[in-house]
């Protein structure tokens, strides 16, 4: 099967929005107008279109897929292939948001015409900024009371520090909104209400809007000629670019993230969606318009580039794992280079395992389709992968590459969770395991002593969302305990311990003597073991028992029973008995030896230190810094980003609980923060005593 659409005719994009800006409705309308079986502009039987729309309205097209493939005929009459990638609504799910931003090539940022740029819009915008994602803006909900397009344009400049290039002006607002002025063609599009937005009339610009349209067209041209020297010179000499040239310049500036074309409409009332789709074709990049993806060559560890080309070796990134009621576990992957055939084996370079591609699906808005082959630029859902998790690279086994070394930080916060009814116990276990498979930064374990189920994640909000998803998706109601910080323990000085284990009580006895030097591991936080035994003081076959014994007690330190980090143990001497010694005897001896030594080797409590980034308007910088200092935070630096200030700090996790509420009230909801685990550091002694007293009582 040959490629159906050229790669330059692909658009992989997402819709970014504040939770209430109308993302679902806009996506639904896009899927409706681009629906595979009902291309607007082709099957133009109003009645059929109406029926389908009503049916879909009753059922509500819910986009349960992480990526939906659909098609659209551009202004030039040529079909394009769209892959719409779902970007999560929860911005605090940093890992997931950033991953979806990674696999899309461009985005539409939605604004609510009534609210303009809201705090969460700022957050999503800044994340897209970090990945340099080309964006267009759609000012939605123009029919809402209080809708104000021009105020939204102003807020983009003041709140986001971005340049919006206005491409359309609204005709009317609130309940009077009926169409838009196209500033390139200089005509007006007015939608017919009776066709549910499927049809519109191209008319002259209303007389009372002609001056405004001229003014905004002038601004549009002024902005776009700046990116092209020849066009700029011609413009200064009085020669205006023609419409095709304007579009070409808007496209270049958008892809280079110099500015953002802005459109308006109301998805709910079906007005303005088709021109937005034409704009996706005209202004957002295809996979070959953006820099080729870089990866690490598994063999040489050097950096390599994989171009978006079917003839390059296969490379793809698994960006989402979802459970599908019909197919089971589906792995969504973006193919960056090469092509993939059903039934072939691919290499998972992160897990170093081969995977066989069983079924390969293309997801459409209201159907799924089995496909035999997929190409560079495609987004596919793969069934039957056993080892692959989010963030893994799948590639040609002969040309291995790792596209992204996903560093999933260790969870830093944990809470006990239990189902509200005994009958939900099993359902809760299944739900938690599925959620853990989808999100590598979330873990589930059982506390051996209390038998409680413990969930661990990247922060309070992360775990709140998990509990919320359990309720919504798996219908399991759960109660949660208070959050607990994942402390650790270590040793701070060298200590030599000599220990003999003897047991004589009839029958075979036990005997083992070990002499071990314990010290902080200079190599880092892992456990290191070395044997310097010479002359057979401890026979070779017993040495693994010594290591195993120490490892078995590392999970519970001497101060408050927390796992231990950064310990090195060197076995230097020992003794054995021909009859009474065994691997088990040496295991017991080394276990007791370490327990004794840990108390004498300067045991110390460690706490997780978080890397906190706060993005705030300038007015609140003083308050934010003062507050972080009061939380034992250390400010690492600050910089301006657009009209906002970014403050970086290291703060102990124990002092970050409920921070989100404080920050919101301090900044009237305009500042936001992200928090990632950075490192472990010693707990100040006064705080350490409190923690020890609290936890020793529990152990």
From Swiss-Prot:
NCBIfam families: EF-G (TIGR00484), PRK12740.1-5 (NF009381), small_GTP (TIGR00231)
One of the record's GO cellular component terms: cytoplasm
CDD domains named in the record: EF-G, EFG_III, EFG_mtEFG1_IV, EFG_mtEFG_C, EFG_mtEFG_II
Role played: Catalyzes the GTP-dependent ribosomal translocation step during translation elongation. During this step, the ribosome changes from the pre-translocational (PRE) to the post-translocational (POST) state as the newly formed A-site-bound peptidyl-tRNA and P-site-bound deacylated tRNA move to the P and E sites, respectively. Catalyzes the coordinated movement of the two tRNA molecules, the mRNA and conformational changes in the ribosome.
UniProt name for this protein: Elongation factor G
Annotated residues for binding of GTP: 17-24, 86-90, 140-143
Keywords assigned by UniProt, alphabetized: Cytoplasm, Elongation factor, GTP-binding, Nucleotide-binding, Protein biosynthesis
SUPFAM superfamilies (UniProt xref): EF-G C-terminal domain-like (SSF54980), P-loop containing nucleoside triphosphate hydrolases (SSF52540), Ribosomal protein S5 domain 2-like (SSF54211), Translation proteins (SSF50447)
Main location: cytoplasm
Biological process annotations from GO: ribosome disassembly
Transmembrane segments: none
Molecular-function GO terms, alphabetical: GTP binding; GTPase activity; translation elongation factor activity
tr-type G domain ranges (all copies): 8-288
Compartments, as annotated in UniProt: Cytoplasm
Gene designation: fusA
Stated family: Belongs to the TRAFAC class translation factor GTPase superfamily. Classic translation factor GTPase family. EF-G/EF-2 subfamily.
């Amino acid at each position: 099967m040959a490629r159906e659409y050229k790669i330059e005719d692909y658009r992989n994009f997402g819709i970014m929005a504040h939770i209430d800006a109308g993302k679902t409705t806009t996506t639904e309308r896009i899927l409706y107008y681009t629906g595979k079986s009902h291309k607007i502009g082709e099957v133009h039987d109003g009645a059929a279109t109406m029926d389908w729309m009503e049916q879909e309205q009753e059922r509500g097209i819910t986009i349960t897929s992480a990526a939906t493939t659909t098609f659209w005929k551009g202004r030039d009459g040529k079909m394009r292939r769209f892959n719409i990638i779902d970007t999560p609504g929860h911005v605090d799910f940093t890992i997931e948001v950033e991953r979806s931003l990674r696999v899309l090539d461009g985005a539409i940022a939605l604004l609510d015409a009534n609210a303009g740029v809201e705090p969460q819009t700022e957050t999503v915008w800044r994340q897209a900024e970090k990945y340099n994602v080309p964006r267009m803006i759609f000012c939605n909900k123009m029919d809402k009371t209080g809708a104000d397009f021009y105020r939204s344009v102003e807020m983009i400049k003041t709140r986001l520090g971005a340049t919006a290039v206005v491409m359309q002006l609204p005709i009317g607002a609130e309940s009077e909104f009926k169409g838009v002025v196209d500033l390139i063609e200089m005509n007006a599009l007015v939608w017919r209400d009776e066709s549910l937005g499927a049809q519109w009339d191209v008319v002259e610009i209303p007389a009372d809007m002609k001056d405004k349209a001229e003014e905004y067209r002038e601004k549009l041209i002024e902005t776009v000629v700046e990116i092209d020297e020849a066009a700029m010179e011609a413009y200064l000499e009085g020669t205006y670019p023609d419409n095709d040239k304007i579009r070409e310049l808007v496209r270049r500036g958008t892809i280079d993230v110099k500015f953002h074309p802005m459109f308006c409409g109301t998805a709910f009332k079906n007005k303005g969606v088709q021109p937005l789709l034409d704009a996706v074709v005209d202004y957002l990049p295809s996979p070959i318009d953006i820099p080729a993806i870089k990866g690490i060559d598994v063999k040489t560890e050097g950096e390599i580039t994989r171009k978006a080309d079917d003839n390059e070796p296969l490379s793809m990134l698994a960006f989402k794992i979802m459970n599908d009621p019909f197919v089971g576990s589906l792995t969504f992957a973006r193919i960056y280079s090469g092509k993939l055939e059903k039934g072939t084996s691919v290499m998972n370079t992160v897990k170093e395992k081969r995977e066989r591609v069983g079924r390969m699906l293309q997801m459409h808005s209201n159907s799924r389709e089995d496909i035999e082959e997929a190409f560079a630029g495609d987004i596919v859902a793969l069934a039957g992968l056993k080892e692959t998790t989010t963030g893994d690279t799948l590639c040609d086994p002969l040309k291995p590459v790792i596209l992204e070394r996903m560093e999933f930080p260790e969870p830093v916060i944990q809470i006990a969770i239990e189902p509200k009814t005994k009958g939900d116990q099993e359902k809760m276990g299944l739900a938690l395991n599925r959620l853990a498979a989808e999100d590598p930064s979330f873990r589930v374990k059982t506390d051996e002593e209390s038998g409680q189920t413990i969930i661990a994640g990247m922060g309070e909000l992360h775990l709140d969302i998990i509990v919320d998803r359990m309720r919504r998706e798996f219908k399991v109601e759960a109660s949660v305990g208070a959050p607990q910080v994942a402390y650790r323990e270590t040793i701070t000085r060298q200590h030599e311990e000599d220990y003999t284990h003897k047991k004589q009580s009839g029958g075979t006895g036990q005997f083992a003597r070990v002499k071990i030097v314990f010290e902080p591991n200079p190599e880092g936080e892992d456990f290191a073991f070395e044997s310097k035994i010479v002359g057979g003081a401890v026979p070779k076959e017993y040495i693994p028992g010594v290591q195993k014994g120490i490892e078995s007690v590392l999970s519970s330190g001497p101060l408050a029973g927390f796992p231990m980090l950064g310990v090195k143990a060197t076995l230097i001497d020992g003794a054995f008995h021909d009859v009474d010694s065994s691997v088990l005897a040496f295991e017991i001896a080394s276990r007791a030896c370490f327990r004794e030594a840990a108390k004498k080797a300067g045991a110390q409590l460690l706490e997780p230190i978080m890397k906190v980034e706060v993005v705030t308007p300038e007015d609140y910088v003083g308050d934010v810094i003062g507050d972080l200092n009061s939380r034992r935070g250390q400010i690492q630096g600050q910089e301006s980003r657009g009209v906002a200030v970014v403050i970086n700090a290291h703060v102990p996790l124990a002092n970050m609980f409920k921070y989100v509420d404080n920050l919101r009230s301090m900044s009237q909801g305009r500042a936001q923060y992200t928090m990632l685990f950075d490192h472990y550091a010693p707990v100040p002694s006064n705080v350490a005593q409190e923690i020890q007293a609290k936890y020793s009582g529990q152990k």
